[in-house]
């Protein structure tokens, strides 16, 4: 039975098979996808806009989980984006659920109990469809291979071990954070064959930003890259 559940879950996420639309509620389909992802898929964890965003991936993301923070920086909940065959399938928020068809059209807007949300106009549906689709595309790009990862995957990099991991992490940081150069002090950065951890400086458009980061690597892929700005304003270029 367990194998059957996993197979159905992955089918929903990857487009290998699908349940009839009336066979399971949207929440149940989300749950099946989550069980399958937890059992069989690789994960990625990257920082973006001040939060650490997790994805379960099979090449492309199947589920992306985004923390929701309040104005005081405290965790209030989580939004989850679900993808089926590489297309946005649904979104789950603390107080709402949304379903999309294969053409990218928002077809359901449900409340936290799984019932049709009240007082939702056609214009509201259209606006929410545009916003969620745009947000999903933005999040999906975070988990695309960086130029450094692409080059390493094709065998175009002669570095090995800790040097390769350091190079991959620097490339990923520049791709995600929008910088063009990374510097570091040897005493403040630990480098290993499976990643780096410590302090670096990233050159961005507004100047140099000191960061405390942790980066993990598996083969030519960066599987985790999380960071926090260190105290102090950007240093001039």
Regions found by a protein language model. Give the residues of each.
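Positively charged n-region of N-terminal signal peptides that target proteins for export
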Residues: 1-4
């Amino acid at each position: 039975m367990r194998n059957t559940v996993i197979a159905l879950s992955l089918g929903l996420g990857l487009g290998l098979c699908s349940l009839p639309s009336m066979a399971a509620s949207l929440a149940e389909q989300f749950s099946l996808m989550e069980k399958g992802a937890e059992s069989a898929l690789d994960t990625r964890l990257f920082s973006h806009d001040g939060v650490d965003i997790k994805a379960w991936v099979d090449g492309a993301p199947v589920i992306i989980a985004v923390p929701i923070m309040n104005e005081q920086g405290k965790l209030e909940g989580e939004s989850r984006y679900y993808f089926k065959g590489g297309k946005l399938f649904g979104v789950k928020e603390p107080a709402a659920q949304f379903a999309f068809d294969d053409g990218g059209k928002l077809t359901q807007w449900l409340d936290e109990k799984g019932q049709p949300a009240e007082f939702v106009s056609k214009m509201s549906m259209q606006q929410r469809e545009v916003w969620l689709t745009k947000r999903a595309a933005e999040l999906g790009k975070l988990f695309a291979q960086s130029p450094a990862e692409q080059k390493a995957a094709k065998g175009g990099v002669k570095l090995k071990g800790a040097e390769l991991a350091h190079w991959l992490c620097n490339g990923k940081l520049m791709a995600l954070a929008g910088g063009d150069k990374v510097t570091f002090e040897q005493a403040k950065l630990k480098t290993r064959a499976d990643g780096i951890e410590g302090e670096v400086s990233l050159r961005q458009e507004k100047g140099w930003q000191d960061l405390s980061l942790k980066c993990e690597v598996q083969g030519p892929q960066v599987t985790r890259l999380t960071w926090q700005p260190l105290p102090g304003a950007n240093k001039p270029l």
